[in-house]
Design a protein with these regions (language model features):
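Conserved PDZ fold ligand-binding element
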Residues: 357-377
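Alpha-helical metal-binding/catalytic segments enriched in His/Glu/Asp
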Residues: 105, 117-118, 123, 128-181, ...
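Metal-dependent peptidase/peptidase-like ectodomains
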Residues: 112, 175-266, 286
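A non-catalytic alpha/beta surface segment that caps or lines the substrate-entry region
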Residues: 46-107
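PDZ/PDZ-like domain micro-motif
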Residues: 257, 350-364, 383
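His/Asp/Glu-rich mid-to-C-terminal helical/loop segments that flank catalytic regions of hydrolases
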Residues: 273-320
Length: 410
C-alpha cells in the first residue's frame, strides 16, 4: 500500500492530521503516517502470530524497500520467522502453536562493524495477557507502544541512507513477540543473519511517543560502554534532558543483545495512563517529540561514527535483578520512569489493586514504605520485597506540599 493511500485513509476516517504549516515538515508528516497506519483498527492490535502482525510486517518491509535498504532476513527475504507456543495465561496446560516474524532491512556501507537499530512492532491484539484494560475486550492499538518506536526507526533509516555516518553498516529491525517475552529479539540474537561478533552497538526504541513538556528522555544501558556517557554528556539537542541509567537489562528488546555482550541503549519517553490499554491511540502521540528524539539519536550516531568499535561493559544487573525479583506483592501503580527527583512518583494507579484501595493517586511521590526510605525506584522495589500477600504497611507519599500516610493491605 502506498503511503499516500494510508494518508487518505486517515483523512477520510476524520483523524486529526497535522496543520498545513506542520505538513511542510516532511519528516514530521512521515512519522504521523507511519504511526497512524500501524496503530489503526485495521491491524487489530498487531498481536504476534495473527493477521494484524502480518499486515504490520508487510508495511515495514515495504517501507524498508522504499528507503532503499537491502533485505536481511532468511533466504534473502525481509523476514525472519520464529515459532513459539502461545498460552493465554501462565497456568494454561496447553498452548497454541504460532509463528511470528521479525522484519530486517540492511544499509551496507562496506564497513567492518554494524550498528543494530530496532523497535518492536507487535502489541496486545484485543487485550491478551499484559493488558491493563478493566473493561470488555477491545483493540489495543499501541500507538506509543510501539508504533512510535517503529516510526522513529524508519526516520533514522531515511536520514542514514542519505549518506551520513558511513563508518558503520546499519541493520534495522522490527521485532515481534516483544509483548509476550522478547521472543523475536531473543530468536535473532541466537540465530543472527549478520555476524554478531561485528555488531558495534544496539539502539532500541520502545515507547518514544509521549515526550513531556520538560523533554525528559529516559535512556537505559548507559553503563554498557564507557563511550555512552562520554558522548551523551556533551549532547545538546532541542532541549532534550537525558535521564541516564546504567543497566543493560530491562523489559525490552535491548536485553537480548546486552546478553550477547553488545553495548546497548534503550530510549523511552515515559509511562502514561494509556499504557497497555485500548486508549493508547495515535491522536495522543507527540510527533514533534518523536522528531526531537530521532534528532538526538542521529546526533549520537554522528558523534560515534569515528570512534571505531565500542568497548562493552557488564553492568550490575545481578544485584538489581535480585532486588527486582525479590518482591511477591505489588501496589498496582505505574512508576514515572522519567521523574528526576527523590522518591518514586506514581504515573498511573490501576483500579482494583492495593494502591487504588488505599487512595493513592497519579502524581503522588512515594517516599517511604514501612521503615524503608524510598529515594528511587530501586528503593521502592526493595521496600516491596519485605512484604507478602496479606501484610499491611504504611506508605508515605508527598502530594503537592502535603505528606500523607496511607495504610496498604497487600
Amino acid at each position: 500500500m502506498q503511503r499516500i493511500g494510508i494518508f487518505l485513509i486517515a483523512l477520510l476516517a476524520g483523524w486529526p492530521l497535522l496543520s498545513a504549516q506542520q505538513m511542510i515538515n516532511a519528516p514530521l508528516l512521515g512519522l504521523q503516517v507511519d504511526v497512524v497506519y500501524l496503530s489503526s483498527d485495521l491491524l487489530e492490535g498487531r498481536e504476534t502470530g495473527k493477521e494484524g502482525e502480518t499486515m504490520a510486517a508487510q508495511y515495514i518491509a515495504h517501507r524498508f524497500q522504499e528507503l532503499g535498504l537491502q533485505p536481511k532476513g532468511a533466504g534473502g527475504s525481509w523476514y525472519q520467522s520464529f515459532d513459539f507456543n502461545y498460552k493465554a495465561h501462565p497456568h494454561a496446560e496447553e498452548g497454541e502453536a504460532r509463528t511470528g516474524k521479525n522484519v530486517l532491512g540492511y544499509l551496507d556501507n562496506g564497513a567492518e562493524q554494524t550498528v543494530i537499530i530496532g523497535a518492536h512492532y507487535d502489541h496486545l491484539g484485543h487485550g491478551i495477557m499484559g493488558s491493563l484494560n478493566a473493561g470488555d475486550p477491545a483493540i489495543h492499538n499501541g500507538a506509543d507502544d510501539n508504533a512510535s518506536g517503529v516510526a522513529a526507526m524508519l526516520r533514522i533509516a531515511e536520514d542514514l541512507k542519505k549518506g551520513r555516518d558511513k563508518n558503520n553498516n546499519y541493520l534495522f529491525m522490527g521485532f515481534s513477540g516483544e509483548e509476550m517475552g522478547l521472543y523475536g529479539s531473543k530468536y535473532f540474537a541466537n540465530n543472527p543473519t549478520i555476524n554478531l561478533g561485528k555488531a558495534n552497538y544496539m539502539l532500541n526504541l520502545d515507547m518514544v511517543g509521549r515526550l513531556n513538556e520538560e523533554k525528559v528522555l529516559a535512556i537505559s544501558g548507559a553503563g554498557t560502554s564507557p563511550a555512552w556517557k562520554e558522548v551523551m554528556e556533551g549532547l545538546s539537542i532541542g532541549g532534550i534532558q537525558a535521564k541516564l541509567s546504567d543497566s543493560g537489562i530491562g523489559p525490552s528488546d535491548h536485553t537480548s543483545f546486552y546478553l550477547k555482550d553488545i553495548p546497548v541503549l534503550h530510549f523511552f519517553t515515559g509511562q502514561h495512563t494509556d499504557y497497555h490499554k485500548p486508549s493508547d491511540d495515535a491522536e495522543l502521540v507527540n510527533y514533534q517529540g518523536i522528531l526531537l528524539v530521532t534528532d538526538y539519536i542521529l546526533a549520537l550516531i554522528d558523534e560515534l561514527d569515528d570512534n571505531g568499535p565500542l568497548a562493552f561493559t557488564k553492568t550490575k544487573d545481578e544485584e538489581e535483578g535480585k532486588r527486582a525479583a525479590a518482591f511477591k506483592v505489588t501496589l498496582g501503580v505505574m512508576p514515572d520512569y522519567v521523574y528526576t527527583g527523590e522518591g518514586m512518583r506514581i504515573d498511573g494507579v490501576i483500579d482494583g489493586r492495593p494502591g487504588a484501595a488505599a487512595g493513592l493517586e497519579n502524581g503522588d511521590i512515594i517516599i517511604r514504605i514501612g521503615d524503608m526510605e524510598v529515594k528511587d525506584i530501586y528503593d521502592y522495589m526493595e521496600g516491596l520485597g519485605k512484604y507478602k500477600v496479606g501484610d499491611k504497611a504504611i506508605v508515605v507519599v508527598k502530594r503537592g506540599e502535603e505528606v500523607i500516610d496511607k495504610e496498604v493491605e497487600f
